[in-house]
């Protein structure tokens, strides 16, 4: 589900005009250029989910900003879009590669929990924590070696010194 689907034949799965400065109406984030949004990408189905996605993007920039370069930031935003819309991530979306192991696997689990919590609050239906752990494993190259049960157990762990803390309200957190 989180990186194992094949696009349908009629779907466009490549980006054209990379480097275009135009903005895309389909992107809930005005910063993402049209070239980064593929026509087959899902679209949030309501304003509440769009707002949650924008909040998650800001949170990602705040807490993971120094750990991802521009390319990996776009990859992560695309993966977050699929997560928010509860859509399978196409195989052509690569995993996110972090810089120099600046973020521990426990921190990524906390990051995932915070993102999940924001999306869960924006919709009546959302993935369970095991599915979130699967998404984390499929999304981050550094988590591929861990099993899903281990990642799920770390989602709300408080047993160590984590740089990324658990946050109940992302909107309030990013405004600080």
Residue locations for each model-derived region?
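Flexible coil/loop and intrinsically disordered linker positions at secondary-structure junctions
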Residues: 8-176
């Amino acid at each position: 589900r989180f990186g194992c689907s094949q696009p349908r034949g009629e779907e466009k799965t490549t980006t054209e005009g990379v480097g275009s400065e135009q903005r895309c109406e389909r992107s809930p984030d005005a910063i993402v250029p049209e070239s980064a949004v593929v026509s087959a990408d899902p679209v949030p189905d309501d304003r509440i989910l769009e707002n949650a996605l924008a909040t998650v993007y800001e949170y990602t920039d705040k807490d993971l900003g120094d750990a991802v370069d521009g390319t990996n930031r776009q990859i992560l935003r695309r993966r977050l879009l699929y997560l928010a819309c509860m859509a399978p991530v196409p195989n052509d979306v690569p995993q996110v590669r972090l810089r120099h192991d600046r973020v521990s696997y426990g921190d990524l689990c906390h990051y995932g929990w915070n993102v999940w919590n924001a999306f869960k609050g924006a919709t009546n239906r959302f993935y369970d924590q095991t599915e979130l752990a699967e998404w984390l494993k499929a999304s981050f190259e550094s988590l591929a070696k861990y099993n899903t049960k281990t990642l799920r157990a770390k989602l709300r762990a408080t047993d160590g010194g984590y740089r990324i803390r658990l946050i109940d309200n992302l909107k309030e957190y990013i405004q600080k």
